[in-house]
Amino acid sequence: MITELTASMIGTFKRCPRRYELEYVHDLKPTETSEALAVGSSYHANVENILKHENYDHGGLAGKMAEAFEKYIDWEDWEAVPEQEFRVRLSRGLYLKGRLDALTANGIPVEHKTTGQYSLEKYIDHLAYDDQIAIYMLVTQSPRAIYTIMQKPTIRQGKNESEAEYLSRISAWYSPEHVMSVNVVRTAGELEAKREEIIYLAKQIRQTKLFWRNPNTCAITSCPYASICLNYEPDMQLVGYEKKARRNEELTI
């Protein structure tokens, strides 16, 4: 039996098995994309074009964020190739797959993140527990990863302020303290421990018969599956949700 897991699948199962079931067993997705997700997707597309030395969309919030990336991140030193998909065998019958935001010329994975947190230092502290970092290091066999962190603006549009005026203020607001590039390092022992953890989790996912809910996660974050969490049945008529074309629509593999 072949099991394929992505970093998102692993993180989702650890946070809430019920959400994992809805998203990756029943393959459901919300029909509408949240504003935050839309901005994040546009920002990533802009950064991809920057790394390819191509033109990008300077409009809107995502455009101003990309301008800050281009100005404050030393991205030209990486000689990076963006959007690198992978499918790597971790153990017998278990494969990790996904997409690196970029891979440098010397094989270091690069990941771009946005955050609404007011303190980038606190966000950086959380990277010590980030599965995605370790997974990307495992698949690239690199002891180091580069994370770029873009803080979303904390300023809001004024009541009598035009969109153009607001975006101009956002451009002026961005400074090096709002945009960071962080080197994350893991020892060989830490990466081996993560590999063993993923193998164990994959076994749990294969064998589980009951995808239980984690109410602690519900209390901390808003879940896009909240409206069907308690009463979803495979034969029910879906409102606000649809079946995905495939389990990992973000990938081509």
PLM features: what roles do these ranges have?
Residues 26, 51-55, 114-117, 138-141:
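Hydrophobic/aromatic-lined pockets within catalytic cores
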